[in-house]
Amino acid sequence: MNQTYGRLVSRAAIAATAMASALLLIKIFAWWYTGSVSILAALVDSLVDIAASLTNLLVVRYSLQPADDEHTFGHGKAESLAALAQSMFISGSALFLFLTSIQNLIKPTPMNDPGVGIGVTVIALICTIILVTFQRWVVRKTQSQAVRADMLHYQSDVMMNGAILIALGLSWYGWHRADALFALGIGIYILYSALRMGYEAVQSLLDRALPDAERQEIIDIVTSWPGVSGAHDLRTRQSGPTRFIQIHLEMEDNLPLVQAHFVADQVEQAILQRFPGSDVIIHQDPCSVVPREGRKFELV
């Protein structure tokens, strides 16, 4: 699983970096030629795209390194750090757009030949839609937090390029403040995306539990298994591609140790079949030692 995960996530990061680099060169020319503040917004965003995607590429490769003596649970948390770094990059670009947009609202400047800007923006829009489609497929296959953060960023780019097209069209017909107004709106949306991305990264670093639906699946697997009378103390988290699952099984007091171990192994394999690559720890408890109030399964 890790090989497939690493290959897909690396390809997504390389594709994002290559596309952002190509679009940056095109947008530099378009901004120089037209003087559009909306194109400047897209240019700044491409610079952030490159920094974020390069960070993703380097961090993802590090996060896929196997566990060692100093990092016994692996390096998967590096993905969350990459997502947090992206949120800071994006917040910085949003603040820059705020300042530039306000300046151009106060003193609007007519742009040169909006048609060039429209052509460049259409190219950027098509390329970004293709990239987001590929990233969404990778996220569906890997559940990578780093690629998901990158995808959210490029999804905002799709909206941004659409808004830029409208702004350039309005400027073409003489409404010069439209350029700055749309750039300001884009900045607000980018900042919102950055804050949401940062929140998700922090939650992962704080070892947030797996989604309720996944935990319920684990409960259903465990409690329906022959030989298991009940279960309690389910604890879960995720680091990179690896889910960490801990649970206590309740078994009959007189069940031989060998048989209890066999049942626990079967339960572990069933969980791994549903969640491949997980790190599963199962503890067996005799029913008599489990407090009565603890016998009703609770999510922890």
Swiss-Prot record:
<dbReference type="GO" id="GO:0015093">
    <property type="term" value="F:ferrous iron transmembrane transporter activity"/>
</dbReference>
<protein>
    <recommendedName>
        <fullName>Cation-efflux pump FieF</fullName>
    </recommendedName>
</protein>
<keyword id="KW-0406">Ion transport</keyword>
<comment type="similarity">
    <text>Belongs to the cation diffusion facilitator (CDF) transporter (TC 2.A.4) family. FieF subfamily.</text>
</comment>
<feature type="binding site">
    <location>
        <position position="153"/>
    </location>
    <ligand>
        <name>Zn(2+)</name>
    </ligand>
</feature>
<dbReference type="InterPro" id="IPR036837">
    <property type="entry name" value="Cation_efflux_CTD_sf"/>
</dbReference>
<dbReference type="GO" id="GO:0046872">
    <property type="term" value="F:metal ion binding"/>
</dbReference>
<keyword id="KW-0862">Zinc</keyword>
<feature type="transmembrane region" description="Helical">
    <location>
        <begin position="114"/>
        <end position="134"/>
    </location>
</feature>
<dbReference type="InterPro" id="IPR027469">
    <property type="entry name" value="Cation_efflux_TMD_sf"/>
</dbReference>
<dbReference type="InterPro" id="IPR050291">
    <property type="entry name" value="CDF_Transporter"/>
</dbReference>
<keyword id="KW-0997">Cell inner membrane</keyword>
<keyword id="KW-0479">Metal-binding</keyword>
<keyword id="KW-0410">Iron transport</keyword>
<keyword id="KW-1133">Transmembrane helix</keyword>
<feature type="transmembrane region" description="Helical">
    <location>
        <begin position="24"/>
        <end position="44"/>
    </location>
</feature>
<keyword id="KW-0472">Membrane</keyword>
<feature type="binding site">
    <location>
        <position position="45"/>
    </location>
    <ligand>
        <name>Zn(2+)</name>
    </ligand>
</feature>
<comment type="function">
    <text>Divalent metal cation transporter which exports Zn(2+), Cd(2+) and possibly Fe(2+). May be involved in zinc and iron detoxification by efflux.</text>
</comment>
<keyword id="KW-0812">Transmembrane</keyword>
<dbReference type="InterPro" id="IPR027470">
    <property type="entry name" value="Cation_efflux_CTD"/>
</dbReference>
<dbReference type="Pfam" id="PF01545">
    <property type="entry name" value="Cation_efflux"/>
</dbReference>
<feature type="binding site">
    <location>
        <position position="157"/>
    </location>
    <ligand>
        <name>Zn(2+)</name>
    </ligand>
</feature>
<keyword id="KW-1003">Cell membrane</keyword>
<dbReference type="GO" id="GO:0015341">
    <property type="term" value="F:zinc efflux antiporter activity"/>
</dbReference>
<dbReference type="Pfam" id="PF16916">
    <property type="entry name" value="ZT_dimer"/>
</dbReference>
<dbReference type="GO" id="GO:0005886">
    <property type="term" value="C:plasma membrane"/>
</dbReference>
<feature type="transmembrane region" description="Helical">
    <location>
        <begin position="82"/>
        <end position="102"/>
    </location>
</feature>
<dbReference type="GO" id="GO:0015086">
    <property type="term" value="F:cadmium ion transmembrane transporter activity"/>
</dbReference>
<feature type="transmembrane region" description="Helical">
    <location>
        <begin position="156"/>
        <end position="176"/>
    </location>
</feature>
<comment type="subunit">
    <text>Homodimer.</text>
</comment>
<keyword id="KW-0864">Zinc transport</keyword>
<dbReference type="GO" id="GO:0006882">
    <property type="term" value="P:intracellular zinc ion homeostasis"/>
</dbReference>
<feature type="transmembrane region" description="Helical">
    <location>
        <begin position="178"/>
        <end position="198"/>
    </location>
</feature>
<dbReference type="InterPro" id="IPR002524">
    <property type="entry name" value="Cation_efflux"/>
</dbReference>
<feature type="binding site">
    <location>
        <position position="49"/>
    </location>
    <ligand>
        <name>Zn(2+)</name>
    </ligand>
</feature>
<keyword id="KW-0813">Transport</keyword>
<dbReference type="InterPro" id="IPR023783">
    <property type="entry name" value="Cation_efflux_FieF"/>
</dbReference>
<keyword id="KW-0408">Iron</keyword>
